[in-house]
Amino acid sequence: MPDATTDSNKPTTTTGARMASDQAGRLMRLATYASVTVAVVLIVTKFVAWLMTDAVSLLSTLIDSFLDAGASLLNLLAVRQALEPPDKEHRFGHGKAEPLAGLAQAAFICGSAVFLVIEAGERLFNPRTIENTAIGYAVMVLAIVLTLFLLAFQRYVVGKTGSIAITADSAHYQMDVLVNISVIVSLALVSTLGWTWADPVLALAIAVYIVWGAW
């Protein structure tokens, strides 16, 4: 029979390795707030960059940031629920909310991926020149820097709390660093070599990554 102290989805306390439960809870909440904030900032900046560059690869990473924001918001709600004290309906706490959030994240994916494939396919057969590439470079560098700072903080929080939700949130942000770097490469190929096909091809690759990440 499980008890409240053995729920693997609650912040755990191990001698010399885990923080006190209230301190761990505060760290977990702070990590979820940080991830949602970063995602929202990136959505705004990438949206502006997409409008100014008309690059479908930027559209793809914008969609990815929308998915990140949704997943991070789910994790925020799950962590808050998991940290609630036991009640009559939840005798052993609310810790099972964290794994459920991981399952719910997959619901964000398919429609966005289909939309991106359609947009990238149209651009592949009707290539366009990318404008204001300097804006695209600047936004992608900003995205990489913010994501790296977020990942460092999440790694610290996971080390202190062992949170399942924060671990899952960190996993897709790790891949986002590579995605953002690939967008920079795509912009460079289009602007310097005139390889207009590189933009939609990368967008299609990101669409595949988005679907793969859901499973």
Range-by-range predicted roles:
Residues 2-40, 45, 52-215:
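Alpha-helical transmembrane segments and adjacent TM-loop junctions that form the membrane-embedded core
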